[in-house]
Each structure stands twice: as C-alpha cells, then as structure tokens.
Regions:
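Carbohydrate-active catalytic/glycan-binding domains of CAZyme proteins
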Residues: 20-345
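Bacterial Sec-dependent N-terminal signal peptides
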Residues: 1-23
Length: 345
C-alpha cells in the first residue's frame, strides 16, 4: 500500500510539472499560465531583479480596416499595453494591462480609437522609474508620434505623460536600447519610414537630448531591434511592406549612433527570404548565458490581429557574424542553446 501511495504521488507530481512548458515552439499558439493565448504583440522584454517582463500591444477581438485609407490598414481598438512575467522564459503569468487605454477622453493619445504600437520598457537606475516608450498614431497613421509613460513598478500602473515628434520628425516603428553606461536610445523609423533615427534620451529617459543620427537614408528599413555584444552593436530590421512579410537585414556598428554597415539577411532555412513570415520586434539577452540572445519576431495575421503569433529563435554566432536558423522547437540548456525536435531546415 505504501508503494502504491508513493507511485500515485509521483504520478501526480509528474502530471503537475507536465503542465509547464519546457521548450519554445516558434509560430505556435503560446498560452499563459492561466491557459489563455498570450496577447503582447510588437513587444519587448525587460529583465529586472530576477524576473523577465514581457510588454506588448493588447489586441482586441475585432479586426477591421480603417476607413478612407488606401493600404491594408488593418487594426483593432487600442487595448493598452499588457505585461507578462516569467522566471524561465517558457511560462508567462499575465500581470494585467499596465498602461490602460483612456476610454473617457476621445482626444487622448491612448483612446481606443488611436493606435498604440511597439511598447518597450527600460529601467532608470538613477530615478528608480520604469520608462515606457511606444509608437502613438491616429486611426489612419497620420499622427506618427512617440509616446512616453512612467511607473514605479514593472507591473504598473504606468502613467501616460505625452506624445511628441522627436527632433521635429515623425516616429513610427521603434525600439529602445539601454547601453552599459546607463545611456538610453530611442530608435525609430522616420521621414515617411524612409530613414531610421537613433536618438539619445535625456538622463531621466523621458525626452530626447537633441543628439541623434540618421541611418540607412531612403532604404525604408523598419521594425528595428538592437543589441550589443563584445563591443559591437547589432541591429536587425525589416523592409517596409505594412503587415506583409519581407526579407530581414542586419547591420553592425562600433557605436550605437553609427555609422552602421548593412551586412545581409541573417535568417536561414525554410522561408528565410520572408523572415519565416515574421517581423522583428526585439532582441532579448538571456540573463547568465554567454552569447545567449533571442530574436523576437511577430507573425502577423492582419485580418485577425489578436491571433498573430510569436516567433522566438536563438541567434547563432560565427565569430562576429550572426545567423538566425529556423527551428521547429528549442530550449535553453546551461550556457548554450539545445535544439529539439525537427529543427534546422
């Protein structure tokens, strides 16, 4: 009887642990710890005090095409910015809507009729504040501004401050980068999406310092994602084709502000010329893992945006060059990536 009870207990423990994910499956439905699909699109991840925080666009259930717009301007009502937390990068707990839409003021930047895209959060060590920047736009994408919000906690609530046209230029697809020296940069597409700007933020991260560079002029590079390794800065971008996929490109520089040198498409494998039907959004350094960087893509479903999926893939280095090989499934193993399932194709 004792052995039977012990066996039963072991089976129960195994059953409990089987509920938790132990691998990442790019492009498949990814559910949170409550069993609901993760809703954090165009997002980025902050690592703070031993926990990862994933912020993203909270998409509504109804996708529609904005009236009077002559391109595939599909959207949902702006649902604010969501946050999920994780200790292991596999299992994510929903922390709620940390930047809530302003449903009462139709003139607000964050009213549901507006566009809130590509939120990114960084922590300011001097002020102790969590600072969020995002792309703010009107329903027809004519406003093309950058918005900023602040919080005392990584799980909010964030207080929306204002929007602006940084350095007198429009701002659309964007990311943030915090350097080793504590300086932070806002990287965004501008000049009608033709040129990428890299702007140094003020010490409190709440405004632009006036120092900026223009990069890849008239190349229409979009959706920037950036990281730094061994003193070299890397940036992955997409082309500019709306919701539709295109070929990624990566570039390198000795300084965040440039000059940047375009290299090639880093993707390898099936549908590499379409970035595996994804678009870059963020590059996630894995804490405690040498050369552990995860390339985060969104796999957009433009006619049902809430069902857009996530493609997370490990970056592989060959000297100073990087590649992003397609894998059906993979997981983290000590200091290296271990590939599982049917992978390199």
């Amino acid at each position: 009887m004792k052995n039977f009870c012990l066996l039963l207990a072991c089976l129960c423990v195994c059953s409990v642990f089987s509920c938790y994910a132990q691998s990442i499956m790019p492009g498949k439905e990814w559910k949170d710890t409550d069993g609901n699909p993760i809703n954090a699109h165009g997002g980025g991840v902050l690592y703070h005090d031993g926990t990862y925080y994933w912020y993203g666009e909270y998409k509504g259930e109804h996708t529609y095409r904005s009236p009077g717009v002559d391109w595939d301007c599909y959207r949902t009502e702006a649902g604010g910015v969501s946050c999920y937390s994780s200790k292991d990068l596999y299992n994510w707990k929903f922390e709620g809507i940390v930047l809530e839409p302003d449903t009462l003021n139709p003139h607000s930047d964050i009213h549901p009729s507006m566009v809130i895209e590509r939120p990114k959060v960084i922590y300011n060590d001097e002020t102790g504040k969590f600072v969020m920047w995002m792309h703010i736009d009107s329903y027809n994408y004519w406003k093309a501004a950058a918005g900023v919000a602040v919080s005392d906690s990584p799980t909010g609530k964030f207080t929306y401050l204002r929007s602006m046209h940084p350095n007198g230029q429009i701002s659309r697809d964007m990311t943030l980068f915090k350097d080793d020296d504590g300086k932070a940069y806002h990287i965004y597409s501008s000049e009608g999406n033709a040129t990428l700007y890299i702007s140094l933020l003020t010490d409190d991260y709440l405004d632009h310092s006036g120092t900026y560079t223009r990069n890849f002029p008239n190349k229409f590079r979009d959706a920037p994602a950036i990281f730094k390794r061994n003193g070299i800065s890397y940036m992955v971008t997409s082309g500019c084709t709306g919701w539709d996929p295109n070929e990624a490109e990566y570039a390198v520089a000795e300084s965040i502000l440039g000059p940047w040198k375009a290299v090639e498409n880093p993707c390898r494998g099936k549908d590499a010329d379409k970035t595996f039907y994804g678009q870059s959004t963020f590059i996630l350094p894995v804490n405690g893992k040498k050369d552990g960087y995860i390339m985060m893509f969104d796999k957009w479903n433009k006619t049902n945006l809430i069902d857009s999926r996530y493609i997370w893939l490990p970056i592989v280095f060959e000297g100073e060059n990087l590649t992003i090989p397609w894998m059906e499934a993979w997981n983290l193993d000590n200091m290296d990536f271990r590939f599982v399932g049917e992978n390199r194709k």
